[in-house]
């Protein structure tokens, strides 16, 4: 087992697996090919210790304590970093939904639909009156929804096959998105 517990992967899609009792388990299949160590970050030169790793056309840094275990040119894959039954965290960018109203973005209730009301999907009152005479910063309103980074913790590894891995549950992002598994 390697000390490095973080790799990059791409999302393949969701499926289901069955346990020994016949229960269906939702799984997300991710693909992670070979990672190559291409450089080191040392405390003397950079102020911290890390590996620079290439996966396909992405280059990322992974913090480690001992660089000696990872010479430049070493190849890493799923079987060297993870094992079945292990719990992992997955970081990825969520699906962007564009400009969304306050109901979809913040789950606010709608206005009345009858008796002459015209504010069906309006935000209603957004602040106080003459005092303070302004809208407080951070007030939840319509705006961009999604497209930000999210971490899902505690996903269990159910299967590892060659360069693919089945994680129990859902991971953020679309099919083909880059994931960081830790």
UniProtKB/Swiss-Prot annotation:
Q: Which UniProt keywords apply?
A: Chloroplast, Plastid, Ribonucleoprotein, Ribosomal protein, RNA-binding, rRNA-binding
Highest taxon of the source?
Eukaryota
Q: Name the GO terms of the biological process aspect.
A: translation
Question: Where is it found, in Gene Ontology cellular component terms?
Answer: chloroplast; cytosolic large ribosomal subunit
Give the molecular function GO annotations: rRNA binding; structural constituent of ribosome
The protein's location, in the record's own words, is: Plastid, Chloroplast
| InterPro entries, A to Z | Ribosomal_uL3, Ribosomal_uL3_bac/org-type, Transl_B-barrel_sf
PANTHER family according to UniProt: 50S RIBOSOMAL PROTEIN L3 (PTHR11229), LARGE RIBOSOMAL SUBUNIT PROTEIN UL3C (PTHR11229:SF16)
Q: What is the role of this chain?
A: One of the primary rRNA binding proteins, it binds directly near the 3'-end of the 23S rRNA, where it nucleates assembly of the 50S subunit.
Q: Which family does it belong to?
A: Belongs to the universal ribosomal protein uL3 family.
Q: How does it assemble?
A: Part of the 50S ribosomal subunit.
Name of this chain's protein: Large ribosomal subunit protein uL3c
Origin organism of this chain? Answer: Cyanidioschyzon merolae (strain NIES-3377 / 10D)
């Amino acid at each position: 087992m390697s000390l490095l517990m973080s790799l990059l992967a791409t999302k393949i899609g969701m499926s289901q697996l069955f346990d020994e009792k016949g229960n269906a388990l939702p799984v997300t299949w991710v693909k992670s090919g070979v990672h190559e160590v291409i450089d080191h970050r040392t405390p003397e030169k950079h102020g911290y210790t890390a590996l620079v790793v290439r996966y396909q056309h992405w280059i990322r840094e992974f913090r480690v304590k001992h660089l000696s275990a990872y010479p430049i040119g070493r190849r890493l894959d799923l079987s060297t970093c993870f094992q079945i039954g292990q719990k992992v965290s997955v970081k990825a960018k969520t699906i962007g939904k564009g400009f969304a109203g306050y109901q979809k973005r913040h789950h606010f209730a709608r206005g009345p639909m009858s008796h002459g009301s015209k504010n069906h999907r309006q935000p209603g009152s957004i602040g106080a009156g003459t005092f303070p005479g302004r809208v407080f910063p951070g007030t939840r309103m319509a705006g961009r929804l999604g497209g930000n980074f999210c971490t899902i913790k505690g996903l269990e590894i159910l299967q590892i096959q060659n360069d693919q891995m089945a994680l129990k549950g859902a991971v953020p992002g679309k099919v083909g998105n880059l994931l960081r598994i830790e």
